[in-house]
Amino acid sequence: MKPDAHQVKQFLLNLQDTICQQLTAVDGAEFVEDSWQREAGGGGRSRVLRNGGVFEQAGVNFSHVHGEAMPASATAHRPELAGRSFEAMGVSLVVHPHNPYVPTSHANVRFFIAEKPGAEPVWWFGGGFDLTPFYGFEEDAIHWHRTARDLCQPFGEDVYPRYKKWCDDYFYLKHRNEQRGIGGLFFDDLNTPDFDHCFAFMQAVGKGYTDAYLPIVERRKAMAYGERERNFQLYRRGRYVEFNLVWDRGTLFGLQTGGRTESILMSMPPLVRWEYDYQPKDGSPEAALSEFIKVRDWG
């Protein structure tokens, strides 16, 4: 089947609506929408929930940008895109909870297509989801990864292990020599065997995110915590900022190509702290995190 960008866009708009409704149902607070237009072509809907009952900040962004030619920074690595018009669309979200026992989560699904008259379109899907706990609970990690594994199952036995490894490799802070969290799924450049198969997988990932995340939120949101846990949460959020500004390809691409800065940086936590040469107390729950986030088979 020929790639159908309109069909993908409708799914993404509906996905943004559904996820916002699900997060509001858990939190009680409403999202505020900020619709925007891109001068060079396209636009989006940025939605943010702030200071809710459960979530300190949750951002769910839809964007659809298009243009007559790709920026040079994009075609340098993919010369086949030169001289083609393009469309790029996706839903990206990050949730930063109040309670340090509730992990931060991130998800993204996206579609890209580049066309020129007389030639086959170049297209692919990408996306995934990952979890960043501050305090490790094995049952949460197992649930997260089993949900990821189960949604991958209909698409092949090798899909989950391949995209889990890609996620582990991608969300890695080289300058800290540590993982950002416990991973999940990450895929990109997906265009085989055909459009329908790839689109179905992207839909499964988009829908699977809340199946993986919300049961963990419900399990942890009422746990008592104090200043020690809050300070550790803010300290560990620093790693999130470091990754996004130093290593994340999507953030860098967006900023380098004139993307909408407010939407790109919507993933940043509202509060964060750094502490020089911080060392958690031996044997403490805080010290246990470094071992918990090491790559392992959670399935």
From Swiss-Prot:
Catalytic activity annotation: coproporphyrinogen III + O2 + 2 H(+) = protoporphyrinogen IX + 2 CO2 + 2 H2O
Enzyme class name: oxidoreductase
Record keyword Metal-binding present: yes
Pathway the protein takes part in: Porphyrin-containing compound metabolism; protoporphyrin-IX biosynthesis; protoporphyrinogen-IX from coproporphyrinogen-III (O2 route): step 1/1
Cellular localisation: Cytoplasm
Alphabetical list of InterPro entries matching this protein: Coprogen_oxidase_aer (IPR001260), Coprogen_oxidase_aer_sf (IPR036406), Coprogen_oxidase_CS (IPR018375)
Annotated binding of a divalent metal cation, by residue: 96, 106, 145, 175
Binding site for substrate: 92, 108-110, 258-260
One GO CC term, this protein: cytoplasm
Family recorded in the similarity comment: Belongs to the aerobic coproporphyrinogen-III oxidase family.
Protein name: Oxygen-dependent coproporphyrinogen-III oxidase
Top-level taxonomy: Bacteria, Pseudomonadati, Pseudomonadota, Gammaproteobacteria, Enterobacterales
Gene: hemF
